[in-house]
Regions:
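Intrinsically disordered, low-complexity N-terminal segments that are enriched in acidic
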Residues: 27, 47-50, 60-267
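Low-complexity, Gly/Ser/Thr/Pro-rich intrinsically disordered linker/tail segments
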Residues: 426-484
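Alpha-helical solenoid scaffolds that mediate protein-protein interactions
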Residues: 41-42
């Protein structure tokens, strides 16, 4: 391979792994030393053979290994910003949110796998959103909450009503208007402008990508109603990750925004209600490194779950059941820092919507069932959040949906009929921007993205460097949601 100019393509080599010494330093949380070891390896001279026996057949080094090291270096640089709370700080954060929380309780939760943590420079640190996982998914912690709990009853009632309508009428539709935007945070912009002036420039050169609704089977009558300023490019309606793109030289900070509307239609499908064709298609059944990979652990799990089963619909149902009944919802760090997502999900039995979707997709593909990614926003009255889900294909019916995280949520709520609903069907409260995982933008973003795999809130590149974390400021809002 030749090293791609798009740094996000380097992630396809992530599974090349780390040298043993760097791997041990990473596991122990000594990130600065690990970065130093990586830098030393990247600087090695490969023009001469290590054993002095003639010309080296790889005079520039092993390109896949070099790409993996460059990605791992950036992962190591970003990890400390994901795991920010010492144990004492984590206890104090929980004590401010629930009654009677103790250090012993935190450590018990760590041992049980309910609190995500890592070592950072030798000190145990908890994930920045660990408290949200506990309060949002564990009724015992919700009952100890200080102050009123969010009302989930109305949302559950809407899901029941939507399910009933879809069963009765075969589909449900909604007309939706969303406004969204992204830009640099003020602090990041001021720092970038100061660097530019120190280099003799008067402005920060910005490139911005904002997700837009894409043309797909469920989305129609898409209207791009307003932009804060004309985009330099709007990607094709059927782009795998559709965006509006701006490029500008800024002397003062500003956000780039869009308002759009569309009709979303969710058809009802029961994958077990028809007889599958004896021969199924082979598209969307391959591996896509670094995450959709047929590891021995996943092959073994898929074989166990489908033992004695020949129907592709029943195989897919068993994968869905395994995930929705076993994988506990956990907020995740940035996907940038995650490795081997489906294997970790299947073994650790925890993850968020995207983690569960990737696990379902990979298990389906191992079993020869076409499966693919879809993502964007989950929208509704007063609601607009990021969301991912999966699609799978069984002839003669065609593409159907699997929303494993919603299914797991319904399992926790004791709503078995709704859990089954999300195997085959979803709901119209969606905005689909991405129809493929790990797809390039149009035009491509060459620097590291905040998320090299998905695009839900947008990406910003300043003076050639991709921004992430608190360097960007994004918003999204559902302006109207009308059931049709």
């Amino acid at each position: 391979m030749t090293m791609p100019a798009d740094q996000n393509e380097w992630f396809r080599c992530l599974n090349a792994g780390l040298p043993d010494d760097v791997s041990r330093l990473k596991a122990a949380g000594y990130y600065e030393e690990a970065i130093g070891r990586i830098d030393a390896r990247l600087a090695e001279d490969w023009t001469a053979s290590q054993n002095g026996a003639g010309a080296n057949p790889a005079p520039a080094g092993v390109e896949a290994q070099r790409a993996a090291l460059l990605v791992q270096r950036e992962i190591l640089r970003r990890l400390p910003a994901e795991y920010i709370y010492t144990e004492q700080q984590a206890v104090e954060k929980m004590q401010a949110r629930v009654t009677g929380f103790t250090l012993e309780e935190l450590r018990a939760l760590e041992r049980a796998g309910w609190v995500d943590w890592r070592f950072v420079e030798g000190e145990k640190r908890c994930l920045d959103r660990f408290d949200e996982t506990l309060l949002d998914t564990d009724p015992a912690f919700a009952a100890r909450r200080r102050g009123p709990a969010p009302d989930s009853g109305a949302a559950l009632a809407r899901r029941r009503a939507t399910h009933a309508k879809m069963v009765r009428e075969g589909a449900a539709s909604a007309r939706i208007t969303v406004e969204a935007g992204i830009g640099m945070s003020d602090a990041a912009f001021e720092a970038a402008l100061a660097r530019a002036r120190a280099q003799g420039r008067s402005a920060v050169h910005l490139r911005v990508w904002l997700p837009l609704p894409a043309a797909c089977a469920s989305q129609s009558d898409i209207r791009l109603e307003h932009f804060s300023e004309p985009p330099a490019r709007i990607a094709a309606a059927d782009a795998p990750q559709r965006t509006a793109y701006w490029e500008a030289d800024l002397t003062a900070n500003r956000r780039f925004t869009a308002r759009y509307s569309y009709t979303q239609t969710a058809p009802y499908a029961d994958p077990l209600s028809f007889v599958p064709d004896p021969v199924q298609p082979a598209f969307d059944t391959g591996e896509e490194a670094p995450h959709i990979v047929f590891t021995p652990a996943l092959r073994a799990l898929a074989a166990q779950l489908t033992r004695g089963v020949t129907s592709p619909a029943e195989k897919a149902r068993r994968f869905y059941d395994y995930i929705t009944r076993n994988v506990h919802y956990h907020y995740q760090p940035s996907y940038f820092v995650l490795e081997d997502i489906p294997t970790r999900c299947a073994m650790d039995r925890r993850g968020d919507c995207g983690v569960m979707a990737l696990t379902f997709i990979t298990l389906c593909r191992i079993a020869g069932i076409p499966a693919r990614w879809q993502s964007g926003l989950a929208v509704g009255p007063g609601k607009c959040g990021c969301h991912d889900w999966a699609m799978f294909y069984i002839a003669p019916r065609g593409w159907m949906y699997a929303d494993c995280s919603y299914g797991a949520s319904m399992a926790r709520a004791g709503e078995e009929e709704l859990r089954r609903h999300y195997f085959g069907s979803i709901d119209p409260g969606r905005m689909v921007a991405n129809r493929a995982f790990q797809a390039a933008f149009d035009p491509p973003m060459l620097g590291f993205r905040a998320d090299p795999y998905d695009n839900q809130t947008g990406e910003v590149e300043a003076d050639g460097a991709g921004l992430w974390g608190e360097q960007t400021a994004a918003f999204k809002e559902t302006l109207s949601y009308e059931e049709l």
